C-alpha cells in the first residue's frame, strides 16, 4: 500500500509539473521583458541553488562569467539557465562536471553550459528542442520531468531575440550555446 501511495504521489507530481510547464509556455508572450538583468549574478544564484543536487550526484560545478547585462524577463532568463544547468547535472556521469561560461561575442552575450555526460546522438540534436522529445525514453522515469524543458529554453531564447543550439556533443559531453542580445549602453 505504501508503494502504491508513493507511485500515485510521484505521478501526481509529474502531472502537476506538466500542467505548470504548459501554462508557463502558453503565457510566454504576455510576460514583461523590461527587466535589467545582470547575467553573472544570475548564474551564480542558480549554481548556488543547484549545488546540493550536484553534490548528491558527485558533480562539480564551475563557472567563468563576464559581467554582462541584458534587458528581458528576469524570471524567464533564470528559468532558461536553470533548465540547462539542471539538465547538465541530471544527465551527467557520477564524478562529472558542469561548466558555465558567459562571454561577449560581438553584440551578444554567449552563455555556454558544458557537461561531461554521455552526449546527445547527432540525429537527436535538433529534436531535443521539440516538446515531449526524449533521447532515452527508458530513463525518463528515473530522470523525472515531462520533456518540455529544452522546448521552453528555446522558446525563451527566441522570445528574447536569441537562440540556443547544441554546439558540441560527443561521448565526452555536450555544450549548449545560448546567444542573447546585450543591453544597449546609454
Mark where each language-model region is.
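Short conserved segment of the HATPase_c
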Residues: 120-134
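Short helix-loop "hinge" at the ATP-lid/N-box region of the Bergerat-fold HATPase_c
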Residues: 88-89
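Acidic ATP/Mg2+-coordinating residue in the GHKL
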Residues: 115
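Short alpha-helical segment of the dimerization/phosphotransfer core of two-component systems
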Residues: 6-15
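Short beta-strand/loop element within the Bergerat-fold HATPase_c
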Residues: 95-107
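Short conserved segments within the C-terminal catalytic ATPase subdomain
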Residues: 53-62, 68
Amino acid at each position: 500500500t505504501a508503494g502504491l501511495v508513493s507511485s500515485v504521489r510521484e505521478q501526481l507530481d509529474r502531472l502537476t509539473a506538466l500542467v505548470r510547464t504548459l501554462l508557463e509556455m502558453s503565457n510566454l508572450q504576455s510576460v514583461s521583458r523590461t527587466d535589467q538583468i545582470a547575467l553573472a549574478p544570475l548564474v551564480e544564484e542558480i549554481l548556488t541553488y543547484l549545488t546540493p543536487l550536484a553534490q548528491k550526484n558527485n558533480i562539480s560545478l564551475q563557472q567563468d562569467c563576464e559581467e554582462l547585462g541584458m534587458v528581458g524577463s528576469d524570471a524567464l532568463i533564470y528559468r532558461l539557465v536553470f533548465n540547462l544547468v539542471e539538465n547538465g547535472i541530471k544527465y551527467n556521469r557520477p564524478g562529472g562536471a558542469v561548466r558555465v561560461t558567459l562571454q561577449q561575442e560581438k553584440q551578444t552575450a554567449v552563455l555556454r553550459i558544458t557537461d561531461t555526460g554521455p552526449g546527445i546522438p547527432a540525429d537527436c540534436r535538433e529534436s531535443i528542442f521539440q516538446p515531449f522529445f526524449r533521447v532515452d525514453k527508458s530513463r525518463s522515469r528515473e530522470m523525472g520531468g515531462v520533456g518540455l524543458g529544452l522546448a521552453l529554453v528555446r522558446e525563451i531564447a527566441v522570445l528574447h531575440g536569441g537562440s540556443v543550439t547544441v554546439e558540441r556533443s560527443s561521448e565526452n559531453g555536450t555544450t549548449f550555446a545560448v546567444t542573447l542580445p546585450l543591453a544597449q549602453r546609454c
